[in-house]
Amino acid sequence: MTTLLKFRKDQKLKGNKYSLNAILMQAISKAFKTFPNSNCSYKDNGEFFINDHHNIGIAVDSKFGLKMPVIKKINDLSLKQINSNLNDKINLTRDNKLTPSDLSDGVISISNLGSFNIRSFDAIILPGQTYILAVGQIFEDVFVDKGKIEIGSIINLTLSCDHRAVDGVLASQFLSSIVQNMEIISDDK
């Protein structure tokens, strides 16, 4: 998390305020590129297919209830564009102006409860999607790195998946790739 937090701090000084969720979306999209078979869907009629685009949802609380708007074709967007589209979807959600299209075609959604001081939790997959990524609070903790005691920022991520669409090995590789991608951040597509 150290690299990610430094990136956000440096970008904020340049006038770019990137949310953790936007960075996670980019990391997920890069993981889909590394493991294209993980970008899959299973429909109740038994149909299984690999998706061409990276469509990622986000849990948004509003006075109208919890909604999961989807940012579509993230694989075609830079981090700045992802961040902008994410902010737009959040505002549409809070203004109760989402269309049915805004809520459809997601493969994975992010549920981030870090702002509620929750370090770890399990989230339930939205019907029709393959995954949900539960994101906990960023916190400092002690850990050992190469035999040396360090203090660093840590975040817990929990990936739940529909095993009809993806097996545990591929899901584990996908999650590991997301974690690695969170430390390799750029504004590239």
Language model segments and positions:
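C-terminal catalytic/motor cores of large multi-domain enzyme assemblies
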Residues: M1-K189
